UniProtKB/Swiss-Prot annotation:
MF terms in GO: L-aspartate N-acetyltransferase activity
InterPro entries: Acyl_CoA_acyltransferase (IPR016181), GNAT_dom (IPR000182), NAT_camello-type (IPR050769)
Residue ranges, compositional bias (Gly residues): 60-70
Source species taxonomy: Eukaryota, Metazoa, Chordata, Craniata, Vertebrata
Annotated keywords: Acyltransferase, Cytoplasm, Endoplasmic reticulum, Membrane, Microsome, Mitochondrion, Transferase, Transmembrane, Transmembrane helix
Protein name: N-acetylaspartate synthetase
UniProt gene name: Nat8l
Gene3D superfamilies: 3.40.630.30
GO CC, one annotated term: intracellular membrane-bounded organelle
Amino acid sequence: MHCGPPDMVCETKIVATEDHEALPGAKKDALLAAAGAMWPPLPAAPGPAAAPPPAAGPQPHGGTGGAGPPEGRGVCIREFRAAEQEAARRIFYDGILERIPNTAFRGLRQHPRTQLLYALLAALCFAVTRSLLLTCLVPAGLLALRYYYSRKVILAYLECALHTDMADIEQYYMKPPGSCFWVAVLDGNVVGIVAARAHEEDNTVELLRMSVDSRFRGKGIAKALGRRVLEFAMLHNYSAVVLGTTAVKVAAHKLYESLGFRHMGASDHYVLPGMTLSLAERLFFQVRYHRYRLQLREE
């Protein structure tokens, strides 16, 4: 298994909240006005004196909601700092681990051919054994194998990521021009992350590594992180923002669509870094890779 580092590209890096003054006045005003028109700001959190008592009832989930942070305190989206390396890695690691059961069980619904194959295996078991008990155990065994191989592949992917770009975020995202890494901070704690990397060959920016701590989802943090990448791309004068995801949850796809991304297609033949492509792995692990694009301007 070989895990190569991601290619880095060259472009002047401008961080949205800190480098606006480096632009000429007219251009700065025009770009920020365009950004504000496309992505209106999140509702301002009320001050402590005006905050009403919390209402009883269920809280939203999924990372795309517009509710304010707990107790009305604001979330700050800013550049990554070297001291936050472990916190960022933890959020990334925990977020990817959640995909093990999602890929093993929920993801099966995206692969009708695999479902048919498993049904044929169960039918074959009954034809050979004439035992209803053994036949009923076949689906449970197949799901157990799906979980095992999903865990195996995703842990191998994490091993690759944690030894390439996530091994040294400062080196991979903060030092090279044309890339950046942001964190969402609440009460001094990192609760979300996102990265951007430019591709000079087609004048696009790729959105990467977006993840929010599971305890703070449903508060609009993921959307705020996504907007920061879009503003970064606009200020750099890139033509589009692109991303790829293997997420199974519908909420993740709704988040991208709410930011203005268009679904450009999906592939069932994507090879996740860390895969060995063994026969058993192909039989019990499948992932669908979705591509999204947000066109900012025509070339």
